[in-house]
Amino acid sequence: LMKYPEYRGEGSVGIGGKLYRQGLIKMNEFVTLCARDRIPIVWLQDTTGIDVGDEAERAELLGLGQSLIYSIENSGVPQIEITMRKGTAAAHYVLGGPQGNNTNAFSLGTAATEINVMNGETAAAAMYSRRLVKDQKAGVDIQPTIDKMNKLIEEYTAKSKPSFCAKDGYVDEVVELPEMRNYIRAFVSCAYQNPASICAFHQMLLPRVIRDFITYKKA
């Protein structure tokens, strides 16, 4: 997406799957409205993380992420989280992940699920790039360092696979995509069969907000 996010100035390009200021604000408002209308929430997750850097810090993205977690935690409505593909770093738990709140009923993964703090290549570069430069300048053999980097990448890859995520409790179950709809239907049915409280349809704000937004966009 060109010229997005706006806080990065001219020439900025938004990356799909990355969380920016507007997205965090919009999700925060949506969770608040779902809580008010007593609507259970299904989170579908494929994210490479929250935007980082000096511009992101000045735009208060960390504070907005904390605000989203606070809204989820205080919503009082049941929620499930499905990691469709990537669930990376803080973005994983601010998007309804089980690590960040007590409203998560359960979490599901797919055959493509990958949950980690960062990918192995990024971790290896962060840990060993300066050592590589230093050894290369000193004329020291860099192959042992490269071997360590490759070993770290393999370890990160192995510990972010769906089977490891299920074994270590990052997800409660790995589900085939054709069966995913049945899990969502069962969750929503349970939520409505035994609600902590209800909101009458004519008192709901969310349908009216969505309708007003669509009308505004068409105009």
Identify the residue ranges that each predicted region occupies.
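Ligand-binding clefts of soluble mixed alpha/beta catalytic domains
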Residues: 1-219
